[in-house]
């Protein structure tokens, strides 16, 4: 067929160009044309086998993936009645993981559409959990483990489950040929990758790296690439900004089979997916122990905290929309090995979620994570990350809790970093003007054995003091731990301030806050740290109007620190002390208006007394300021009159602004000459008096100019002469130029006239010659 086409083309060339083109020029043209045609056909033929090969590989991958997912779905769905799986609304992205109460879960993470942090969520229950998802959520693993890895590792050690979740966005089920109970979750597809690792590898996790490196694709080393469907838009796009998540205890390159390509190469083929990702960095002293229910309640190193925050109405910008919503949890990006905190961003969730024990709760319920501390002595474990769903209200609350042992205050001060308790430097940076930025930890519960019961949406400050009192009695008296509990969360609008820089940690004996200008007086009280809970209660409404700060002492007196009503809004920070000898001074930066909500224990009386004292002080200050202003005005008037008199001291005639027609400076009012004043007001002024006054004014103005100008006044004459000389030189140069131009033009004109005259003479002579010749 190819030869026939080539011969036909050659014959057509011979027919069209038999005479015009010679054979030496025809042959190279035909050869070039045929080679181009042959190359196009050859590339097309080579492309067909590749397409067929790709389609067969894709079909094989789909079949294998459907088989694996059916087996995993049977295992996961079998636990669904136990944990009461409940689907979420498809509008808000959220991944919720649950387990038994004695199993430490590591992360509950949610994904914001706007955030572009690459990342992953790692879960470590001892039994498989139930996962549900909607909208793009990306986790550590993209694929399912290979059977060779399962066989190799199951033959050596006893198995424990490490759940690695992957949720991808798709309006329908992941594969249309899936069977069984998985089709009931077709609107929220999810792939649960179950990797069997050894129990010994959990201890090995302490020294391994769990980090995120940019400029590589997300890959879990020993996962086969055949389980990825490269044609469907659910597969995650592996671009340069995506981070690599290396799971500890699993070699990412050693167990890779040679006939399988890397998952990142397969994922790179997809250019359609736009999913948002999270980076969850886990400290390296983390996944070590698995406490039982008894050890959770009895061991001093394990903290169980269940807390909920009431709904807080969000504060938005004027140009707010869904793409610009930003929660309070704004801070520095998480770093590898960070023991102090975990940063998360959340999109407002909708719908209901599962509680910690698996029972269905209201939309304001919470999903709580319990974490066992690490093996490293004295170092604390990362606390609880808690995501509160506030129903249809678009204001999520992120709660970070930091648990630590009594040893940790002295050994690792970075753990007790409370970003609402800075020392003098950070406090000054965060409270000047409107530049108030709340850190990502909006609620803390660092008590060792406390468990705050879940509250409804309306409870804000009523029952907190009783719970604090009970928690104080139940706390161990030998552990000097500063406890900050249930601080009301505050929503800060986007762009209202700059992020706080360098929040220092709370040392075992904190320094006194040195900002004396922020408060008129500080209330000091001694607090024994072994048995006293020193809370910091903040309530800030959506319009930033009400701000109240109280300190609870041993006698349980509330000492409010109030600000003036006209000052800009700022945060109120209390610095509690641990030692009983050091007093605690309350420093407040003023708020917009006085609080209209009062707590218990006679707060209204104290507040009214404070208000009266403040009003008295303000009145006294106002009177003093008015007196000072009057004195300043009198001084200025005296100075003006003195200067006028000085100007006219040299004048023999009556000086100053006397009325026209009156010769004396002071009219004789005492003698009853009021008629003279009335006549003087209508008298035409004499010219001599006006001239004298004008001369005095001009003389005073000249003296003032000389005094102010100083030595510059003596330079006016030479500067003027220099400027005049420069202008004269420029004028002379210009005039010379103009004269030369005129001379040149005149010379040209003269030449032109002479040439014309010569030509006329030549013409006349030629005519004469020609006429002579004719005759």
From Swiss-Prot:
Q: Which residues carry this modification: Phosphoserine?
A: 770-771
Question: What induces or represses this gene?
Answer: Transcriptionally regulated by FOXO3.
Which protein are we looking at?
A: Armadillo-like helical domain-containing protein 4
Gene responsible for this protein: Armh4
Which InterPro entries did the record assign? ARMH4
Q: Name one GO cellular component term.
A: membrane
Report the SS bond pairs. none
From which organism does this entry originate?
Mus musculus
Signal peptide range equals 1-47
